[in-house]
């Protein structure tokens, strides 16, 4: 079975949370908690989803490149919306005990390239923050006061382009430390560590969902914009310019609506120019421009 009933490959689905998970043992508690079913199991990257709960998940396997590729595959396969949140959750090594603690990675550094990423808005009331180093092979030295994983840098390089950096999150649960060797990690332990944090994960998702809804509203296209585009046959280039200037115009004149009668004999470029002039003449906040 490669598809679950109700999930169509070519439809634009309404997923709020997109999970990119390295290991099946890490994914299993999330799949169960959010009632996800298999959507795609014939490719390198298995996908699970539940449109009703708003969750989609891809299992990437280990490695930064695989994480980036799996995120891209999930985005394209399910036609994920631009307002969805992207979350990389999994186990990580840490420089101190205990295992089982959960952290938000507020800075992710690729040990291989030195590139640094700063994913997500801080969820300081819910989870502590830590720096995370993405390495190409398991880290046993714990030389830095930081988390260690093998995927997050690749995820952080790709995922923000699907939504925005503020909706890109890296959450890690400590699985090994200098006093708890990575050689002791089992599938059962991995699953247990994540299951114990499910209530806190749910609280984190509640906060992220607020941001998702805000972004959805920001990206929504008002009916009057669609009416103008249909009436005046905007090219794709002019459509983009029109939507951008409309957004600024609406910030400047929040109580006004576009009056079709003012533009009956106008061309798309003339409509854009008229709105630009009104914004320039009346904008009180220079950030609007």
Model segments located where?
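Glycine-rich phosphate- or other oxyanion-binding loops that anchor nucleotides, phosphorylated ligands
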Residues: 42-289
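N-terminal beta1-alpha1 ligand-phosphate binding loop
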Residues: 16-37
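A short, well-structured beta->alpha microelement
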Residues: 2-5, 38-47
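Short, low-complexity, intrinsically disordered N-terminal peptides in bacterial proteins
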Residues: 1-14, 287-289
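Extreme N-terminal starter segment of soluble prokaryotic enzymes
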Residues: 11-18, 55
